[in-house]
Amino acid sequence: MSDFNPSTQLIGELALINCRDLGGMPLSGGRTFRKGIFIRSGSPEWLNHNEFLAVKKYGVTTVVDLRATAELEEFGNPFKDDPDTDFFSIPLFVGNPNDLNDKTMDYLRTHHLGDYYVIIMEELGDQVCQVLRVLLNSQGITLFHCAHGKDRTGVIAACLYLLAKASREDIINNYKVSFDYLGHFLDPLMARTSDDMKHTLRSDAINMEIFLNYIDSKWNGDIRLFMKSNGMTDVEIGSLYSKCIGES
């Protein structure tokens, strides 16, 4: 693991929760992940009008909402009908995570979040690659988000970091700090969540370890094989890699 401090990626001037630039992450060969192209966060549903305008002024021109259809319908998204924003809804959750009777939420009573991340890759691989294509083809700054910016968002961030050749340790460290950045926001929700579901609000290192172990075992540690298996071409994969490292 490098001595990289993930807190340097925080974007404090925006009111989005858990908002970070993916840039600055150390990569193999002495490279660093390109700054100013991809940012991640929790849902923008909480933004007031001035905070919404500040995100646009920051340079965000594309928004990818990874939340379930039910979440988008219930809570909305201020960017959905904004004429200046290319908006994409690409759900990485089938069902409704706010329904504790949902089959995935019931599954998480006895499984790690990391097991759910594997389900995303196994069952929603096409959607994951749809997101990656949007990131490849977007101009300006692209924001991708889910509800809290740690799970579905964390899967996409991990895919990008794997493609760009960040270290396993740095990817895990970058993942697990989400709960540190969300604590103040999640405290009330944590207080009323049952003990068997509290882990779903955290970002324990074991979750990303499970995800990376899956990539190692199923895809020989090469995220490109996953991408190709789900329809991305060598040209697309190479172009996204170049964009991530600043050579596009």
Per-segment meaning from a language model:
Residues 1-143, 156-248:
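Cys-dependent protein tyrosine phosphatase-like superfamily
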Residues 148, 152-153:
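Ser/Thr-glycine-rich phosphate-binding loops at phosphate-binding pockets of nucleotides
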